[in-house]
Amino acid sequence: IFRSAAALNMDAVLLTSACSDPLYRRAIRVSMGTVFQVPWTYIENKNVSWPQGGMDLLHEYGFKTVAMALRNDSVRIDDEKLHEEEKLAIILGTEGDGLAAETMADCDYTVKIPMSHGVDSLNVAAASAVAFW
């Protein structure tokens, strides 16, 4: 995810406590060192919890939030209204369980990547690269 964020000019990566440590030796190696190129921070602290506090903070700072999720009400990632938004925060879940229902409910948009018949999902690294593009 960090390598894609660096390659595709993302402004920053926000992490929760559930994320892997980006400074772990293997994470640095897998990211090809891009963890040192992209600004990042944890969105949680003693005053802000995830998901509710973090989502509130993003909205307070003027971000529209985008949940990457396969749902019937999801808009396509190439939907024009997404391109019109000035500040987007892309919310990614785990590969197995995805995002919690409460997190998706707090997002301004739920977005899907159109895929060929018979393929229903991408891993989170591939999906993030498509979303960042």
Language-model segment annotations:
Residues V66-V119:
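Active-site/ligand-binding-proximal alpha/beta "capping" segment
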Residues S4-L8, C19-F36, A101-W133:
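Structured adenosyl-cofactor binding patch, chiefly the S-adenosyl-L-methionine
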Residues I1-D73:
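RNA substrate-binding interface of SAM-dependent RNA methyltransferases
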Residues H59-G62, E86, A126:
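Generic low-complexity, intrinsically disordered sequence content enriched
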